[in-house]
């Protein structure tokens, strides 16, 4: 018997999305971003399905070590870099690349005693203003990295876009111009493009692209769908009806009794709630897919359950499947109803949700 709720992960969709992104960036290698437990899809699940990727991008050293322990031998890159002097030796031991975005990291590299140098990606702040060396720091920091025996040569170069998910925003082109101006004629690989830039700013694809959300079949752009770019949703979040009840006009349902039926109907209770990561703030009308149609959430989402209006003539029964998002109901559309982004929905599922590779 399959557990519920569960996130069904399509390995075929993951592979198809990688293939599609290679088609969109044929001159670039792919650094598949699998941070945050593979965007909620399961870190090892995703890495093994995407074994043909040229490398994997991660946020935490622990994630990289989990991949190495799971038999992944591909290039690994720590996108936030390292934070403790002891981490530097771990990078060498497990052959892990690191971003260097702050002088404190450079100081740790300069002070380390290592068996071999570390592969470094120097991050330049071209306009995101979150991580990276300012443009006026670039020359001095680059020369220190060049002089550091613990840094493998050539030094790789990167930046991150603030507004690539706004296809009409000129800020991305300006960031790319600044990057090119600072790095022209320098050796080393370059990476600028995240998912949005890969899809919308082809001129920024460079040596490596760093797709994250697009690998999972989701568009990074609000109001857009992954399928518009030939991508397939890799996650289907499913549960089931655990009750179907006749409900009279005027009667409330759920905590606070704030929703009341305008007419006689049937309500279905779905076994999923905010304890599973489904947003408590999902408003009335948020769609759920039941037996080939969309039905609206009514009443407040509770810890373990939510309620949907099935309609007076519904023939749904206990045990029927309810799809919270997936092929028939894109996660981007659910996110728009709730007032959030698809990234948040797929990454906030709790351990109560079984993640099952199909």
Curated annotation (Swiss-Prot):
Pathway: Amino-acid biosynthesis; D-alanine biosynthesis; D-alanine from L-alanine: step 1/1
Active site: 35, 255
Cofactor: pyridoxal 5'-phosphate
One Gene Ontology term, aspect cellular component: cytosol
Residues that bear N6-(pyridoxal phosphate)lysine: 35
The keyword ATP-binding appears for this protein: no
Keywords tagged on the record: Isomerase, Pyridoxal phosphate
GO MF: alanine racemase activity; pyridoxal phosphate binding
Transmembrane segments: none
Stored PROSITE patterns: ALANINE_RACEMASE (PS00395)
UniProt similarity note: Belongs to the alanine racemase family.
HAMAP family per the UniProt record, alphabetical: Ala_racemase (MF_01201)
Name by which UniProt lists this protein: Alanine racemase
Gene source species: Shewanella loihica (strain ATCC BAA-1088 / PV-4)
